[in-house]
């Protein structure tokens, strides 16, 4: 069974239910993004948006990177009763293309409630937001204009 626990508000409840569904010889597999500073694909935009729309992410929503360290992930899984926990850390490069591609795809694929909040910004604030995001991408932008982000992923396996 493979699960991405960042989407569960009550991760312990979900993990315990998963554990109860596994055979005694079963293995759990989980992949999570690293901390936001190790996955700037997300943080470059999200940090900027939060400056313009403080309630962009609803209060009480789980942090996207709450399991983004080996220690946090290990603790969560161990607390749910799993054993023989192994976590591997991978960092790879990901390119969303040039800035306009990155920005347009973000706007295209965000959830409807978030898109509605962005659409409430007046045009001058939307332009300013886009400029802040563009500034955030500069450290990852090559001379040819292509953005290349590092992307950390933690992959965990654990036994029942």
What positions do the PLM features span?
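Generic structural signal for conserved hydrophobic packing positions in ordered secondary structure
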Residues: 1-4, 45, 102
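Conserved Class I S-adenosyl-L-methionine
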Residues: 62-160
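Short conserved AdoMet
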Residues: 9, 23, 160
